Amino acid sequence: MDLFEKCRKFTAAKEAIESGIYPYFIPLNENEGTEVVFQGKRLIMCGSNNYLGLTTHPKVREAAIKAIERYGTSCTGSRFLNGTLAMHEQLEKELAEWVGKESALVFSTGMQTNLGTVSALISRDDVIVLDKDDHASIVDGARLGYGKI
């Protein structure tokens, strides 16, 4: 029995590419956050995590450059394993002040963010409509919220 026979028989992706309807790895000419240029046409980007378009905001870019100059390109791991930096504490302090609370704690991952936020927003009497392609963290957050899915 050939373990890879099933893989060789799977041709849907190849057929989609050949027919020009493959939706992945689309080559973009420009990426301006909430808009992209594809084959010379400016389009709205609906698949991005840049919901507010802040990745291209001049103040965000400037702050990112300063952070890279001070800390490098990453923290190289989560706060749980590699420690909390001053910028983590500063962010939490500023967030707490902004919402008028004594303190704040930011989530360390996108998964945790969606689980915590979505589950907190949904109560037993709420109904949530999910897209079949929603990230697992959104679906799990909805389930944790006890609402009707």
Spans of features found by a protein language model:
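Conserved N-terminal alpha-helix of the aminotransferase class I/II PLP-enzyme fold
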Residues: 62, 66-110
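Active-site-proximal loop->helix
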Residues: 120, 137-146
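Conserved PLP-anchoring active-site segment centered on the Schiff-base-forming lysine
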Residues: 117-136
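N-terminal "arm"/small-domain region of PLP-dependent enzymes with the aminotransferase-like
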Residues: 8-73
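Short, structured coil segments at secondary-structure junctions
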Residues: 100, 124, 144-146
